[in-house]
């Protein structure tokens, strides 16, 4: 079935608390999507973030980001008093440093009220999430006690989970552990309310999970035997990408690599649990770097570049079969961008999952024809660009004149109309699903770029300051109906 949606990170929503939250503005965005006759709201990973602020480097593969908790909703639920809700601040880019300094004290007031007389909803939540929640809360409490040091720099007894050290920590840090559990309860209570509302409005939430966990994560700390470590929770090999025309030294991501034989011996139980959790909070799940299941680039830990790595065979079809067994065959989007071998393409075909198409990549005048829309297949998801691309207006301003000319010739438009023409090309193409970034519908320039890969500084900070009008929603709806992507009218 043909359908469409909009890519909009939660942190990019407007709102009064310095970052997008799960409050009124998120519900208003659902209303906008419904009026625009959309089916999907695609977001970025929603886990807690640390140094660098990347949602793809989270402290947990299961937890939610405390920054997204809406204070107004906490007040409505009785966990904050009205005068404890901070005064509104103007909508600007996300200041993660300010959030780091200001949020914990406010959330602690709410947590203290909850913990003074825990509700049945809270105890039920803790019981349902016990497969990750206790370890995550203890990890975060220990991390604070260690001055926010990374896991690799913790004392040996704590890093390696020596039983006596953990038992003492659970007593010593009991209040902090309870705080982190309460915060997760607040997050998932608000998330559940938003998802319920979205689904009632006919909007499905498309989540995003990184293939790898962070080297500073409760996941690695809790189950180091599932990763390529030395037995002391130090990494032996790390993830990345090999050198190519765009990066002479490759990309050194530094994430832990999975010990796939161990996962296979356990029938991929950890991954099944991860994916079942993801499919419980999202309607559709995009898996980042899907090709890494077929083979992955392995770099010796301690290397300063990715140049010394090598490709290693992954679980391939065994993983796909395990996911089919646990989840069925739908509800997954495979991010299959980058270096694809015939083996990767065979694995993707066997999975039945749709891959991704990026319209901006179609118009490389040096390699004409490779990624043009006529090459797309129905079982795919097409984007003008993703969070890793500049906006289409930004692309028009920064791409080579030859590329812009090529795009305009193909799309039969002038440079001034290129963004709208590229959106129309996405909506009209054969791909079953089309996702357009919100910034492209607004014709915003490079200032609205979400992330520039392999850089630090101003990523993950863009927020929406342009009003989403009924006029824009009706324009989107008109094109959605025109290209037969609108849901059936009730």
Residue ranges: model-predicted function:
Residues 1-37:
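Mature N-terminal, pre-catalytic/accessory segment of carbohydrate-active enzymes
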Residues 9, 53-184, 188, 213-435, ...:
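Alpha-amylase-like alpha-glycosidases and glucanotransferases acting on alpha-linked glucans and related
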Residues 24-31, 189-197, 271-273, 418-422:
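Short alpha-helical segments and helix-capping/turn motifs at coil-helix boundaries
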Residues 24-49, 277-282:
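Catalytic domains of carbohydrate-active enzymes, especially glycoside hydrolases
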Residues 34, 191-199, 324, 348-349:
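Surface-exposed amphipathic alpha-helices with a cationic face
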Residues 35, 158-159, 165, 462, ...:
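Domain-scale activation on soluble regions of proteins
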Residues 44, 204-206, 210, 284, ...:
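Outer-envelope exported proteins of Gram-negative bacteria
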Residues 180-213:
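Conserved, well-ordered alpha-helix/loop/beta-strand core segments that scaffold catalytic motifs
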